[in-house]
Amino acid sequence: MPYVNIKVTDEGVTAEQKRQLIEGVTELLERVLNKPRYATSVVIDEVATDNWGVGGESVTTLRNKERNSGQR
């Protein structure tokens, strides 16, 4: 019984995008591992950017730097 946990920052992932992720991951496990759809669980966790760090800085800080420098 596969369990897949997808973590994304809480920056506006839509319900439709989540639906597509759940469907796509389920199809992938069915195709690659021959796992039945009914046995696959997919959980999407949205994490606040203050709670996600990359390279020693929070995503909030990184996004602010990107905005200030015109990147992204």
Segments the model singles out, each with a brief description of its role:
Residues 2-72:
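A domain-level signal for the structural core that forms small-molecule/cofactor-binding pockets
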